[in-house]
Amino acid sequence: MLGTGIVNPELDLDIDLVIAQYTRTMSISDRYVSFTVVQPTGELASTVTLPNAPNFQNQTKSDGLGDTQILFSAGLYNLPPLTQENYASFKPDFAVGGLARLTLPTGEYDENKSANLGANRYSIQLGAPITFGFGESFLDPRLTTFDLLPSVTFFGDNDDPFNAGTVSQSALYKLEAHLTHNFNPGIWASIDGVYSYGGETETDGQSNDNKQRSFNMGATLGIQFSKSLGLKLSYC
């Protein structure tokens, strides 16, 4: 259910998630490389109103693990691997990277429910992160960055969907933008925007006429307690 990119005006979702993330960075062939595993867990409650029966509502709850995500990223231009000493003196500027995010169907899923934490399918996102940095170094307490992420996501089929045989989805194109500013070494905030296009679904070969063309905005507050521990709060 999560990660489809589809906006449904007849669907009301209430989602509470706790997200665990492990990241490992390294240098391969003089390039910065990062490996990340993301595991969400939480609870989802949904209310679906049918367009042809507005007085009928289908309510569903799902709790447990969400789908596991595995992310690989690498520096392609002006993102060299940095030692601790070089990191403190490196001046951020225009830089380009590459990423691949694989989502595995490991989340809680019940074919008898109209909404689930898991999507019961694989997906892969390919993108090219672009960064513009404004500051003396990554440790600049007043560092400002502007990040763009053009990407495309390809989806596998869900062969066990609610009240159907197969659900498929066409590629979803996205452009994410984030303007981030450090207020001091331990607190930062960002304004976030996402434009989505495509991602139309088909149920048993019939189009659901739900191609996306949407723009969403939000804000994020980050608090860093130590080099390895931080808290991030987002609203969208």
Question: Where are the predicted features?
Answer:
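Transmembrane beta-strands of outer-membrane beta-barrel proteins
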Residues: 33-37, 70, 94-100, 144-150, ...
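Residues that define the transmembrane beta-barrel architecture of outer-membrane proteins
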Residues: 12-18, 63-70, 92-94, 118-124, ...
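Residues on the lipid-exposed face of transmembrane beta-strands in outer-membrane beta-barrel proteins
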Residues: 20-24, 70-76, 100, 126-132, ...
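Outer membrane beta-barrel transmembrane domains
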Residues: 158-236
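Surface-exposed strand-loop-strand hairpins of Gram-negative outer-membrane beta-barrel proteins
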Residues: 1-17, 56-58, 111-116
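Hydrophobic alpha-helical segments and helix pairs
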Residues: 64-122
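Transmembrane beta-strands of outer-membrane beta-barrel pores
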Residues: 39-45, 76, 102-108, 132-134, ...
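Short loop/turn motifs that connect adjacent beta-strands in outer-membrane beta-barrel proteins
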Residues: 25-33, 78-95, 135-144, 186, ...
